């Protein structure tokens, strides 16, 4: 198996839909019931690069494994449920600390899933026009008002950049990195992953260039062979 060129990791509390998001994108289906034990991953070829996407368990007993899966990650998808504010708070309280093992220039996406269960948006049409934005659809009486607003995710994103001591001017804008999705309908799922792929690829190329510059030509550094001079009798 070819070694991945980059890594993306999904983090978040249990039941926010991390596995469903990944399976919706990779397998084009919505699983009825699924629970990740420990971790699982897919390989996605994007352009000429191989990117691994890691799904992690949100259960407390598997919490410590998160930092292991985040090691060397180029991007982290922090996932919450738009209908449960506590799942957004948990990202900062429980999961942000697990990202210490990620790359120093790691990207962060804040993703509010299960937007199909709210009364504020029509998500039946699949992909829409952009992250953290969308046209207001007709209200459905069986749905509930959204409990977490896009501006809450934007605030968390900016807080993460400060926590990581990353220059906000050098990182993608919050509006580009905060998404609302529905794994059930596919709303914004392709947009989420492919936005990250397009951002991660230049990072991979830059890392390869830096590694190439640091490569030393051992042959050119060999000490010239000395010849022993002899004495004439």
UniProtKB/Swiss-Prot annotation:
GO terms classed as biological process: cellular response to type II interferon; phagosome acidification; phagosome-lysosome fusion; protein transport
Keyword Electron transport: no
Lipid moiety-binding residues (S-geranylgeranyl cysteine): 231-232
Residue interval(s) of motif Switch 1: 28-41
Subcellular location: Cytoplasmic vesicle, Phagosome; Cytoplasmic vesicle, Phagosome membrane; Golgi apparatus
Obligatory cofactor(s): Mg(2+)
Binding site for Mg(2+): 19, 36, 55
Reactions it catalyzes: GTP + H2O = GDP + phosphate + H(+)
Top-level class of the enzyme under EC nomenclature: hydrolase
Gene3D superfamilies in alphabetical order: P-loop containing nucleotide triphosphate hydrolases
Entry's Gene Ontology cellular component terms: Golgi apparatus; phagocytic vesicle; phagocytic vesicle membrane
Tissue specificity: Present in a variety of tissues, but not in brain.
Biased composition (Basic and acidic residues): 119-130
Keywords carried by this UniProt record: Cytoplasmic vesicle, Golgi apparatus, GTP-binding, Hydrolase, Lipoprotein, Magnesium, Membrane, Metal-binding, Nucleotide-binding, Prenylation, Protein transport, Transport
Record's bilayer topology term: Lipid-anchor
Keyword Electron transport set for record: no
Superkingdom of the source species: Eukaryota
E.C. number(s) listed in UniProt: 3.6.5.2
Motif Switch 2 location, chain numbering: 55-72
Binding site for GTP: 17-19, 32, 36, 58, 113-114, 116, 183-184
Activity regulation comment: Regulated by guanine nucleotide exchange factors (GEFs) which promote the exchange of bound GDP for free GTP. Regulated by GTPase activating proteins (GAPs) which increase the GTP hydrolysis activity. Inhibited by GDP dissociation inhibitors (GDIs).
Record comment regarding domains: Switch 1, switch 2 and the interswitch regions are characteristic of Rab GTPases and mediate the interactions with Rab downstream effectors. The switch regions undergo conformational changes upon nucleotide binding which drive interaction with specific sets of effector proteins, with most effectors only binding to GTP-bound Rab.
Family: Belongs to the small GTPase superfamily. Rab family.
The protein's role, per its UniProt record: Plays a role in apical endocytosis/recycling. Plays a role in the maturation and acidification of phagosomes that engulf pathogens, such as S.aureus and Mycobacterium. Plays a role in the fusion of phagosomes with lysosomes.
PANTHER family: DRAB5-RELATED
Name of the protein in its database record: Ras-related protein Rab-20
Organism: Mus musculus
Gene: Rab20
């Amino acid at each position: 198996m070819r070694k991945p060129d980059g890594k993306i990791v999904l983090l978040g509390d249990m039941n926010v839909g991390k596995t469903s998001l990944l399976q919706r994108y990779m397998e084009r289906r919505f699983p009825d019931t699924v629970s990740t034990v420990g971790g699982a991953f897919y390989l996605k070829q994007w352009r000429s690069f191989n990117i691994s996407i890691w799904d992690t368990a949100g259960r407390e007993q598997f919490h410590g494994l998160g930092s292991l899966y985040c090691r060397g990650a180029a991007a982290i998808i922090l996932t919450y449920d738009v209908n449960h504010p506590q799942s957004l708070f948990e990202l900062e309280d429980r999961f942000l600390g697990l990202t210490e093992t990620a790359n120093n220039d790691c990207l962060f996406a804040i993703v509010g899933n299960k937007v199909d269960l709210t009364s504020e948006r029509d998500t039946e049409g699949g992909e829409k026009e952009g992250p953290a934005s969308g046209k207001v659809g007709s209200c459905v009486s069986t749905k509930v008002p959204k409990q977490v607003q896009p501006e809450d995710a934007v605030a968390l994103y900016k807080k993460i950049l400060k926590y990581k001591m990353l220059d906000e001017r050098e990182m993608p804008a919050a509006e580009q990195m905060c998404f609302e999705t529905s794994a059930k309908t596919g709303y914004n799922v392709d947009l989420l992953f492919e936005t990250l792929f397009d951002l991660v690829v230049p990072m991979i190329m830059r890392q390869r260039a830096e590694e190439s510059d640091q490569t030393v030509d051992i042959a050119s550094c060999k000490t010239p062979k000395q010849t022993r001079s002899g004495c004439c009798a």
